[in-house]
């Protein structure tokens, strides 16, 4: 499959007259939460081959999307990626730390820039759970193991950050970063196993236990988030990096 993915990315390069500078897996596969029928969520960064494409009165589209079979492909122009990185965007962070790489960077385009603000990450992961719980209140709850795993992952990321750690991308590595009671840890591992095998064996009582833990954790996160302070990044280093990339100095 990797060869087919790279072939498709090369086709996009040719069609759009771009150079893909980085490509990775994002989402369930990059987290180690995929199953046999999971799609491939491919994310890439690119730059236009012609400098003139960056020197226009109207901006060119900075997102490229392609759906092909099992592949869901999204690419961001390096200008967009740098801007979002300067704004502490959590998604670009996860792209850059993915361990499932299709095209390696020939140089680190984000070298010298600080990590994503931990406070922004905490709010991001809290917000995902908040959205799910609001749906539950409206009777639109997604009762799948997948949804629970995504909420669990958000909670574990929050706790890792609270310990001063950078959350690991792989779920099993992330579990290792966080202190969990043995019962809770075993239930989470069981949900992962059931989800990956698409064979639910976990009991309704155990799922109720997990659901209550998710809700209790969310309340705690919201309360502690009230004390967060935020770091605003200086955009000038990003502007210089973008200029150097476009002019070929980087």
Labelled PLM ranges:
Residues 107-236:
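Conserved nucleotidyltransferase catalytic core and NTase-mimicking acidic/glycine-rich helix/loop elements
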Residues 95-111:
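Short, glycine/charge-rich beta-strand/loop segments that flank catalytic centers
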Residues 63-68, 97-99, 132-139:
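Short acidic (Asp/Glu) patches
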Residues 231-250:
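Acidic, carboxylate-rich catalytic segments that either coordinate divalent cations
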Residues 1, 49-51, 77, 101-105, ...:
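General structural signal for secondary-structure boundaries
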Residues 1-20, 24-37, 43-95:
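Metal-dependent nucleotidyltransferase catalytic core
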Residues 26, 98, 174-177:
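Short acidic/histidine-centered micro-motifs embedded in hydrophobic/aromatic stretches
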Residues 92, 103, 158:
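Glycine-rich, aromatic-lined ligand/substrate-binding cores of catalytic
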């Amino acid at each position: 499959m990797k060869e087919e993915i790279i072939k498709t990315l090369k086709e996009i390069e040719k069609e759009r007259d771009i150079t893909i500078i980085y490509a990775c897996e994002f989402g369930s596969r990059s987290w180690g939460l995929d199953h046999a029928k999971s799609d491939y969520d491919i994310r890439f960064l690119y730059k236009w081959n012609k400098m003139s494409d960056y020197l226009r009165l109207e901006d060119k589209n900075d997102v490229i999307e392609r759906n092909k079979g099992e592949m869901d492909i999204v690419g961001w122009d390096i200008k967009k990626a740098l801007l979002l990185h300067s704004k502490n965007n959590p998604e670009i962070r996860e792209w850059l730390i993915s361990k499932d790489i299709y095209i390696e960077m020939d140089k680190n385009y984000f070298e010298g820039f600080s990590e994503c603000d931990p406070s922004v990450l905490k709010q991001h992961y809290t917000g995902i759970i908040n959205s799910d719980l609001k749906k539950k209140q409206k009777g639109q709850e997604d009762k799948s193991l997948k949804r629970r795993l995504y909420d669990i992952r958000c909670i574990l990321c929050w706790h890792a950050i609270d310990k001063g750690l950078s959350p690991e991308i792989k779920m099993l590595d992330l579990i290792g970063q966080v202190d969990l009671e043995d019962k809770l840890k075993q239930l989470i591992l069981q949900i992962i196993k059931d989800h990956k095998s698409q064979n639910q064996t976990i009991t309704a009582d155990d799922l109720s236990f997990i659901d209550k833990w998710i809700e209790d954790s969310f309340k705690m996160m919201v309360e502690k988030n009230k004390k967060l302070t935020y770091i605003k990044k200086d955009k000038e280093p990003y502007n210089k990096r973008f200029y150097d990339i476009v002019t070929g100095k980087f």
